[in-house]
From Swiss-Prot:
Protein name as catalogued: Histone deacetylase 2
Names of the cofactor(s): Zn(2+)
Superkingdom per UniProt: Eukaryota
Active site: 201 (proton donor/acceptor)
EC number, as in UniProt: 3.5.1.98
Organism the protein comes from: Arabidopsis thaliana
Database matches in SUPFAM superfamilies: Arginase/deacetylase
Keywords: Chromatin regulator, Hydrolase, Metal-binding, Nucleus, Repressor, Transcription, Transcription regulation, Zinc
Role according to the record: Responsible for the deacetylation of lysine residues on the N-terminal part of the core histones (H2A, H2B, H3 and H4). Histone deacetylation gives a tag for epigenetic repression and plays an important role in transcriptional regulation, cell cycle progression and developmental events. Histone deacetylases act via the formation of large multiprotein complexes.
Residue ranges, annotated region (Histone deacetylase): 73-382
Localization (cell): Nucleus
Binding site for Zn(2+): 238, 240, 318
Length: 387
């Protein structure tokens, strides 16, 4: 009996030991697997952190800002969310923050555009903005005082930031989405107009001059990767120097910058001027004929020096005679001629063109922009009705 009991006990111990060893074996395997996965993840995260270009690429490829636009829509991008209305304090800045909606209303009422044919963009997300902007810069916009400095509307500093995000920065983010989408539309259809955008004073690290996000820089980085564009020309004809995109892209030989601006007004960014490939300075009081002559010469030089696959045209109307900030004396017809010249420049060379409306600080700017777009339609340079 005792002998049998010993054998039984030994058998149980042997079985328990086998189970223990088997359990330990599998536990070690699982631990090694989990450690390996965690290590791979850490390496991957470290790799992403140490390779910002890889992270930028991932963000661009995963973005939803590019989407297919049906042929029932034309290449004009706008959202009612573009317009900024913030308890009336937006009127403290000379910029007409409702001009974008007024441009579209003119085009519709004049019979050149149907509301249902307008393309509405998506809002640029934080991940989209991080393609160019730093986390620190985007976090700085959580301060209403920072946004007040950028928009040059001091009372904004006293409002809760959630209101500032909704009433000021959200419209800007929608316009950024419009600029980025415009490049895709332009490559598909030859041209696209974002009735907004052109925030050419904002760099990756700093906003200013009513420009909170660097939509031109973002648009170009998206185009490089998603559209396989290798050469982009920026034609910046806003009255002010485009120091934002110059700072961000000036040392990139894939980008050629033609900037025609008044050097006697903001932003006086002498460092950024070094990055301009073709600098055309027009002094305060420059009239229409002289301006258009200089533009013709500039476009001729640009066509000899660079062969772009995409043109970003920053078509500010602050060159208009009477504009309180631009200080130039260009007539409304002069702006129409200017826009037509740039569109013909691109059409003759079969280059897709993106137009952004940028600056313009008079109530009459909306009417002038609409008239110019209508002229482009009459000249057959754009098509404002669906095919």
């Amino acid at each position: 009996m005792t002998h049998t009991r010993v054998i039984s006990t030994w058998t149980e111990l042997t079985r328990d030991l086998a189970i223990y060893l088997l359990f330990t074996f599998f536990a070690i395997k699982v631990f090694k697997f989990l450690f390996s996965c965690n290590r791979t993840s850490e390496i991957s995260s470290f790799s992403m952190a140490t390779h910002p270009e890889a992270l930028r690429r991932e963000r661009i490829l995963n973005s939803k800002l590019y989407f297919d636009v049906p042929l029932s829509k034309v290449s004009i991008i706008y959202s009612s969310s573009y317009d900024i209305s913030f308890m009336g304090i937006e009127k403290l800045h000379p910029f007409d923050s409702s001009k974008w909606g007024r441009v579209c209303k003119f085009l519709v009422s004049d019979g050149f555009l149907e509301e249902k044919a307008i393309v509405e963009p998506l809002e640029a997300s934080k991940i989209d903005l991080l393609v160019v902007h730093s986390e620190n810069y985007l976090n700085s916009l959580k301060s209403s005082a920072t946004v007040a400095r950028i928009t040059e509307v001091a009372p904004v500093a006293f409002f809760p930031n959630f209101l500032v995000q909704q009433k000021v920065l959200y419209p800007f983010r929608k316009q950024v989405g419009g600029t980025i989408l415009a490049a895709k539309l332009a490559t598909e259809r030859g041209w696209a107009i974002n009735i907004g955008g052109g925030f050419h004073h904002c760099t990756a690290e700093r906003g200013g001059g009513f420009c909170a996000f660097a939509d031109i820089s973002l648009c170009i980085h998206f185009a490089f990767l998603r559209l396989r564009i290798s050469r982009v020309m920026i034609i910046d004809l806003d009255a002010h120097q485009g120091n934002g995109h110059e700072t961000d892209l000036g040392d990139d030989n894939r980008v050629y910058i033609l900037d025609m601006y008044n050097p006697e007004i903001y932003p006086f960014d002498y460092r950024a001027r070094r990055f301009i490939d073709q600098k055309v300075e027009v002094m305060s009081g420059t009239t229409t004929d002289e301006y258009l002559r200089k533009l013709d010469e500039a476009l001729e030089v640009a066509s000899r020096n660079f062969q772009p696959e995409l043109v970003i045209y920053n078509a500010g109307t602050d060159i208009l005679d009477g504009d309180p900030l631009g200080l130039l004396k260009i007539s409304p017809d002069g702006i129409t001629s200017r826009d037509e010249k740039v569109f013909r420049f691109a059409r003759e060379k079969n280059i897709p063109l993106v137009m952004l409306t940028s600056g313009g600080y008079m109530k009459s700017s909306a009417r002038v922009i609409a008239d110019s777009i209508e002229n482009l339609s009459r000249q057959g340079l754009i098509q404002t009705r669906p095919e």
